[in-house]
C-alpha cells in the first residue's frame, strides 16, 4: 500500500478506510466513520462520495429493516394460510429471496447493499452470531433439567438407535461408493453431512416443540429425552476421540471433569442461592443478572479454547440455570424479545448468504445422469434421513408408543433446525465445507424446517397434549405405593375443605402420601404471569405472601401427621383465567400425580337456602381439566367439616355409590385407600339396573360383587369385613333418587363416579334434570340443594388418555 498514492489518501479522507490494489491489505481510520453525511453526498461529490448505505450504521439499519420486512412477510403469509411454520424458516426464506435478487446481476445494487466485499468488519453478521449464541443460552434457561433425570429406558433406546443406525448406514454408503468409483465429495464432507443428518439436537427439538406448543406434553418430554440421549452419545464420542489423541487427550479429559465439577458444585449452588435471596413475587436484582451473564461469557471463552463449537458453553450455562421464576423467567423476559426480534433474524437470514444458487441451477442438470457433486450430496441426505425416520418409528412402535405418536416422534427427531444451520456456518469457517457443500446442506435444513411442522400439525392430535403413556390413576396404583395428589385452591374458603380432604387419607409409613398444593390466583389487567414454588422462594421479612394462609394451613397439617408419611409442596400460579388449566395440567404431568382434586365452583349457606358464591370461571376451568388432565380427576363438593362426626365420638361414615364403568372402579379404588383409616366406616351401595326389552347385558355398565371384592381387597387379608356392600335393584331414575334420599343422613361423605349409571335404568329421567354436567347424574342429585343432608360429595373421573 503506497502512502503517497493520492487515491489512497482520498479514500481514507472520504471513506474512512482504504484497500490496497491487490486486495491483500486493509487500513481504517480510528475512530471509525459510521454515519453518512446525508443523501446529498453522492450527488455533490460523484467521484469520491459514498451512498448512505455504504456507511456502517445506515448499512446495519438497512439490513435489519430488510430482514425484518421479509421475515414478517413470510410469517404473516403463513399465518394467513393457516400453515404452522416456525419463525426460523421464515427468516431463512427472507435471505434466500434477497440472495436470488442479488445474484441475478453480479455487482448489482442489492448485492453491494447486502453483501459488500470491502474488507470491513461485518457488523450485521457479528450481531447475528451473537443472537445465535444468546438464543442457545435462553433455550438452555427455558429447559427443565430435572426432566432429563427422568429419562426412561425406552427413550434411551430410541435416542441411541436414531443416531447410531443412520450414522452407520451413511458410513456404509460412503464406503460402497468409494469402492465402486471415484467420489465427487471428499470423505470429510461425507462424514459431516452424515453426522448432521444422523443427530437430533436437543435444543433444536425443544425449539420445534415449543413453537408447536407441545413441549410440556408427555409426548414432548419423551421426544426431548430421546434427543438428550443422542446429544449425550455425541458428547461421549467426541470426548472419546479427544482422549485418544495422544498427549492432548489426558489434559482435555481433565478439563472435561473440571468443567462438569464447576457446573455441578459451584454454578448450580450459586443459582439456587440467588433464587433463595429473591423474595417471592419480587424481581431478581440486576447484579445477579450481570453475574450470570459474566459466567456465561467466561464459560464460552473457556469452551472456545478447549473444545469445538464453543456455542455449547452458553447452552450449558443456560441448562445450569433453574428454569422458571424468578431467575430463569427474569433472564428470558429481559433478553428474549430483543434477541428474537432483532438479532436472531440477522443470523437466520445472513447465514444463507453463502448459498451458491447459480451453481445449484447448473448442477441440477446432472441429477438425471445420477452423477456429480449435487447428486451425491442430495442422495446421501435423503438416504440417511429415510433410514433415520424408519428406524425411529419402528423402535418407538416396538416399545409400545402408539402408532400415530411413533410417526410424529420420527418426524420431530428427523427435523433439521437452527442448530444444524449454526453448525454448518461453523464448519464453513473451519474450511471443512465449501460453498457447494453448504448450499446443499443449508437448503436441506430449510426444506426440512418447512415441511416437518406441516406434517406434524396434520398427524398430531392437540387435544391429547396432556395425555400420558403410563397409567396415572388410583385403580392401577399398587397397595404399598405412594399416592401422589394435586389439590387446587382458588379462594380462602377452599383451604379448610382441602385440608380436611387430605386428612381423610391418614397417611402412614405403609401408606405414604405426596400432596402438591396449587394456589390459583387470577391476574387482572396487564400483570405478568408467574409461577412460584414456595419450597424454593420465601417471602421477604416484613411482607405478606398472597398464599400465606395456604402455606400456614398445610404446614400445620404436616406437623400433626407423621412427617415421614407425608410430603407437601406448595405452589402459586398467577395467570389469566383462560390459561389456568394449562398450569394445572402441566404441574400434574410434571409431578406424575395420580389424582387431581378440584373444588366445586358453587357453595351454599349453612341451611342451603341461598347461594354464597357461583364462580363460572372456576366451572369452566373444571370442565377443561376434566377433558385434558393426564390423570384421574376429582371434584369435591364441600358442605360441612369432614371430621364433625368424630367430635361426637363416632366413626366417619363414607358411602361409595357404584353401578359400573371405569369411573365407578376409580371410586372404589379411592374408597379402598380411605379404608386404611381405622376411624372410617365404609359402605358400598351397588345399584343394579333392571334391563328393559331393548337393552342387553353388554349394552349397559356392569359391575358384579366379585369385581367389587377384587378392588376392595387388601394385602393383609383376602377377606376383610371392614366394609359392607348393599345391593339395590333399580328400574328408573326416580327410584334411584328415592334410595339416595333415604340414606342422606346416614353418611358424611358420598363418593361416586362421574359416568356412573350413564345410559342405564339407574339414571333414566335424571339426565334431563342434571344441572352440573361435571358432576354426572348421580353426583348432581346428591350435590343439589334439594338433597336433605349436608353431606359432602366427591365425584371421580378416571384417567382419560
Curated annotation (Swiss-Prot):
Tissue/organ expression: Expressed in pollen.
Membrane topology qualifier: Multi-pass membrane protein
Subcellular localization, as worded in the UniProt entry: Membrane
GO biological process: potassium ion transport; proton transmembrane transport
Main location class: membrane
InterPro entries: Cation/H_exchanger_TM, CPA2_transporter, Na+/solute_symporter_sf
Annotated keywords: Antiport, Ion transport, Membrane, Potassium, Potassium transport, Transmembrane, Transmembrane helix, Transport
GO molecular function: antiporter activity
Keyword Membrane: yes
TM segment ranges: 58-78, 83-103, 128-148, 154-174, 192-212, 223-243, 254-274, 287-307, 312-332, 340-360, 377-397, 407-427, 438-458
GO cellular component: membrane
Family: Belongs to the monovalent cation:proton antiporter 2 (CPA2) transporter (TC 2.A.37) family. CHX (TC 2.A.37.4) subfamily.
Function noted in UniProt: May operate as a cation/H(+) antiporter.
Protein name, as recorded: Cation/H(+) antiporter 7
